[in-house]
Structures are given as C-alpha cells and as structure tokens.
C-alpha cells in the first residue's frame, strides 16, 4: 500500500480582489466568517496581480489568462498585449511576414482584407490600437478593400463605451479614403467559449453572408440603434453596416481574414467555424475558403497561419512536478478549466506525466447572476474527495464565481457568490487539515470587490488592478513576505513542499519556514 500523500493545495478564487472600502464591495458586504477568520489568524499577505508585475502594461488590470500563466510559470511572463505594443511602437509589427503576406496575397488577387476582433481598449482579449495598426498595415501595403468586423466589448470596459472606438475607426477610414466598418456585433455572440453555437452562428452569418438582424448606414448609427433597443455593447445584435450605394462586405473565396484577438479562449470557437473543414458546431450556410490568420495560436489543432507563435516556457510548475515524479490534479468548472490546465501549464495543452484533470460543468444559464453559486457545491465535493484520497502531491483548483458573477455587475448576486465560496473554503480547509496537507488561498485578479464605477455610476463589470489576498493554512510555522506577485506562488509552493526551485523560476517564496 502506497503512503497517503499530504497534498499542497492551491485554491484560486477567481476575481476575488482586496479593497478596504465597503462601498460597492461584494466581498466586504458578504458574510464571510471563514475567510475573515483565516485572514485574522493565519499567515497572509497581499500580492500584485496586475500591470508590470504580471507582464502587462503599467496599471493595466489583470485577467485570468495572464494570472494563471504567471501563477504556473513562477516568473513574470510578458503578455501578448505588451509584446504587441512594443512591436507596433518599434514598427516590427508592420514587417511581420505572416501579416504582410496575407495582405499582399489579397491585394495581388484583387480580393478583400477582412479584419475582425474585439474593438476595445480593455486589453484583455485584444486592443483597439493593435486593430488600428493592422488597418494601417493593410492600407500602407496597398489593399483597396479593407473591411473591419467589430466585436463590441462592454465587459472588460464600461457597458456602453463602444461609440468612441467606432468613431475613431470611421474617422480613420475616411482619412485613408478606403476601407470601412462592415459589421458590428456584441462579444456575447462572436466570442462565446461554452459551445453555445447558436450565438456564434449569428456572428458567422453576419460576416460571411453580410446578413444580420439589423442594418445601419454607419457603425455609430448601428450602435445608437442598439442602445435604443436597450442592448449594451456586449449584447449588440448582429448589425450589417451598409450605406446606400456601397458594395456589401460578404466574404468570398480567396479573401484574407485576420483575427486580431490575442487571447485564445474566446477566439477558438469562431475561428474553428471559419477554418475547420469538418466543423459541426452548426450547419454553415456559407463555407468560405479564406486565407485566415490568427494573431496568436488559439489552439495547436487549429491549422492555419499564426502571426505571433507562442514562446515556449520551460520548467513551469506542472512540468517541474512531472520531472520530479510528483502527482498533480487540476480541477475547475468549464469557465475556468482552460485556466488551471492550458494556461497554468504555460500554454501546453497535453497533461504532463502524473497530471490528472477533473472538469465540472458550469451551469447552463444565460448569465451567472441567475445562479451565483454556479457549480461550486459539486466542485467542492470532488476537491475534498481528491484531498482525502491521498493520491496527489499537489492540487490546483479554481472557483470561477467571484469573476463570472462579478462580470454581470449585479451586486446582490456577487454577494451570494462570495458567500457560497466562504462555505466551500470551510470544507476545503477542514479537509486539508484533516490529512496534514498545506493550502494556499489566493486570486488571479480582482473583480467582485468593485461592483460600481465611482466615476460613471455605471455597473463595474470589468476586472480591477487591485492586489489579491494570499493565505497559508498548514502545520508549518511560516512568516509572510511583503511585496509579492502572482509569479511568486509557484516558488512558494515548491519551497513549502521542500523541493528545489528550478532556475527558470525567478519568483521568490512568500512564506518562509521559521
């Protein structure tokens, strides 16, 4: 009989930031006796989860993808956003061979260059500055037909903030004397990640067929009509932009389509609809043979050109565990499963040796304020069983509630989500202590601690750039170190496990054993 393992457990409370003001703070307005007691009695510290400390631009809010990459890598990982900002500033972007070839191919064949992406200054899935640079690249290289298909945000940005962005692009096309915004649609449709293919189909038809529920002469007019229908940016219905006398922008064989989102998880479904010959998410009314470019690699099995292939990370936490013959479990709900697997492993899809995974289905509801507890009860039951099983050296778990319910902007629901989490943490803490294991509780970024934007008075549906908590539960006598960041977590776990820290990990342990 093998010896029962005492696991090192990392619980990531997604979107659970730290803010001392109670006003509009779902975490402080919730009843959280368990987290309150842990914070009062256990070794703890605050760590940075945004900006330069996670490889993002200064003061840029953190997000789940960035957070989990840094958590697993044990070093600051410069994100695609920062990398692209530098490329554009230094103008190497304009010489990227994949992008220039795609534009030249369309231009030389008299075909259109279609550019699609999330038109947002949010910097989470994309940045409008990158899309602007792509428009400039296409124009500079002589493309005549340049069509922008704008996905609208309102989730990583205020709920009604797209007008300024659309106007900026309409002005740009006017100045260039060519190109135009061809369609607008909310990210709810174009950027689903939970196999809700009926939504994706609407965005696909909009772009391939130039058919939507609505039509407008200009993008700004289309947006204003959506607001009049009470649709915020995220939920704007498929709208064709087509003034009298204009040729429509329906996609044709031989056209180029460049997807300017850099974050993978919400880019995959619509990309597969365009690229995969055997696609079966919905019956495509029109299949177009496009020259399709992904800005970054959205998945290894999507076979199409990539402008910025991933830089590989060596000796992430998961890989280091495998090299040291340790067993590990990754567990979460659908919404954050990719984060504790693919992103935590530095963009590696395949599990490492000794790595097991458990996926709990997220509830099928339109928005998570309708079920703020999500699937946390089932997730906790499975997590507790795994802790007590004695099978795993380490377990990584993500609870999505604080983030997914925080995104709805509904304060009462976010409070319920936080209270559900407190109950879960109680069970997890008891399980860890009962087997003599160790537990770190942290977050990947903030969200639920700021539910209203003090400047606008609108619901605050985006992430924050506030610090996140880090709490230690275990038998070791440890002292907390101040000034930490997400990339210090993996080295902290290794040191608490008594393991060597690989040299690639430049993070420092945040709990020193006394």
UniProtKB/Swiss-Prot annotation:
Name of the protein described by the UniProt record: 2,3-bisphosphoglycerate-independent phosphoglycerate mutase
The Gene Ontology terms for molecular function here are: manganese ion binding; phosphoglycerate mutase activity
Q: Which HAMAP family match?
A: GpmI (MF_01038)
| Cofactor: binding details | Binds 2 manganese ions per subunit.
**Keyword flag Cell wall biogenesis/degradation:** no
- Keyword Nucleotide-binding listed: no
Q: Which UniProt keywords apply?
A: Glycolysis, Isomerase, Manganese, Metal-binding
What this protein catalyses is: (2R)-2-phosphoglycerate = (2R)-3-phosphoglycerate
Pathway given for this chain reads: Carbohydrate degradation; glycolysis; pyruvate from D-glyceraldehyde 3-phosphate: step 3/5
- A Gene Ontology term for the protein's cellular component: cytosol
Cofactor(s) in the UniProt record = Mn(2+)
Catalytic site residues?
64 (phosphoserine intermediate)
Protein task: Catalyzes the interconversion of 2-phosphoglycerate and 3-phosphoglycerate.
Signal sequence bounds? none
Q: Which gene encodes it?
A: gpmI
SUPFAM superfamilies attached to this UniProt entry: 2,3-Bisphosphoglycerate-independent phosphoglycerate mutase, substrate-binding domain (SSF64158), Alkaline phosphatase-like (SSF53649)
Positions bound to Mn(2+) 1: 403, 407, 463
Which residues are Mn(2+) 2-binding?
Answer: 14, 64, 444-445
